[in-house]
Amino acid sequence: MKPPRIALIHATPLAVSPINDSFKSLWPQAICQNLLDDSLSVDLARDGELTEAMIKRFLNLTHYTLSAGADAILFTCSAFGVAIEACAKESNVPVLKPNEAMFDEALSLARTDKKLKVALLATFNPSIASMSEELNQMAKAKAIDLDLVTAHVPVAMQHLANGDAQKHHDLIAQTAAQLPPCDVILLAQFSMAAAKQTVSEKLKNSNLPVLSSPVCAVQALQKALGFDTHIDQIN
């Protein structure tokens, strides 16, 4: 079978390594095409909302990847749900939102006899509103009674950008330890994936599942394109 070409569209350089590392570990046969426009996150933080001009830029990136022969497109920027939906409508290949697969896995933990309590941690504050809406909509569609708690981890992303990954991980873990009781913790940004082990160690006495987006996304794309997913997992 011909190796699939997966377009990875980023709005921050911090997301590039986590998803490429997951592909190398889980699906090394895939050919990854990375496109980065790091001004998108800057502009969203400045404007406070997703504008028509930003959506058009996403469409332009999508059209480029399709012209380059992409078999699937994965967006790694978690604050641009509406723009990604617009791109999916103009694509003839699978298009995946960054957290869609992780949300599906979290919702699979739901039980009929009680609410599913989910904690969503984010280091990029503008992403919380759109991600919360997306998760709530997915839960509603599945008739799942969801209790969602969100928390922003300020300055953690800046520490990561400055090269202090351990401080970034520690801040996320400290915030996780202060959360109310829940059934699962979700790490919102792709750039948070490397903090998963630190968070799990901080919560080791609770056996609480901690999910990150990159691994879930790779596995979902494998399934969408009909490739074998029975391989070693790093999630």
Name each model-derived stretch.
Residues M1-N235:
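Non-catalytic structural scaffold of enzyme domains
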